[in-house]
């Protein structure tokens, strides 16, 4: 059976400090805020669309009533 010898090291292997950690966290936070803002815009757009449909229904009903009165009188 053979053995593999490794050279002795004078220092412990260290990992370089993560200098971009704060930048990465800021980018992640910005991405989350961007997604949240997009969801908010979508919700507002949907609400606006519902209000527009409701308003259109009122206008169409008013037109029908007006046409009925004009036809009958």
UniProtKB/Swiss-Prot annotation:
This is Probable movement protein p8. The keyword Plastid does not apply. Residues 16-27 have a biased composition (Basic and acidic residues). Keywords: Transport, Viral movement protein. One of its GO terms (biological process) is transport of virus in host, cell to cell. InterPro entries: Tombusvirus_movement. Residues 1-12 have a biased composition (Polar residues). GO terms for cellular component: host cell wall. Residues 1-48 are annotated as: Disordered. Belongs to the carmovirus/necrovirus/panicovirus movement protein p8 family. Disulfide bonds: none annotated. It comes from Panicum mosaic virus (strain United States/Kansas 109S). The keyword Transport applies. Cell-to-cell movement. It is found in: Host cell wall.
């Amino acid at each position: 059976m053979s053995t593999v010898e490794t050279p002795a090291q004078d220092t412990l292997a260290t990992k370089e400090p993560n200098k971009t950690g704060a930048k990465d966290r800021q980018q992640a936070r910005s991405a989350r805020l961007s997604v949240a803002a997009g969801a908010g815009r979508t919700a507002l757009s949907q609400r606006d669309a519902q209000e527009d449909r409701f308003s259109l229904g009122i206008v169409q009903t008013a037109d029908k009533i007006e046409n009925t009165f004009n036809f009958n009188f």
